[in-house]
Amino acid sequence: QTCASRCPRPCNAGLCCSIYGYCGSGAAYCGAGNCRCQCRG
């Protein structure tokens, strides 16, 4: 199950949910065009 299906806050604090459905940090997860939800961590 991907984090995208658990929006709006699917990830641990400080992480973002990417458009590919994984929680993580950095531009690949949090950046514009890459983030699905919880984009400020």
Swiss-Prot record:
Recorded GO MF terms: chitin binding
Annotated Chitin-binding type-1 domain residues: 4-41
GO terms, biological process: defense response to fungus; killing of cells of another organism
InterPro entries on file: Chitin-bd_1 (IPR001002), Chitin-binding_1_CS (IPR018371), Endochitinase-like_sf (IPR036861)
SMART domains (alphabetical): ChtBD1
Known partners and oligomeric status: Monomer.
Name this polypeptide is given: Antifungal peptide 2
Species in which this protein is naturally found: Eucommia ulmoides
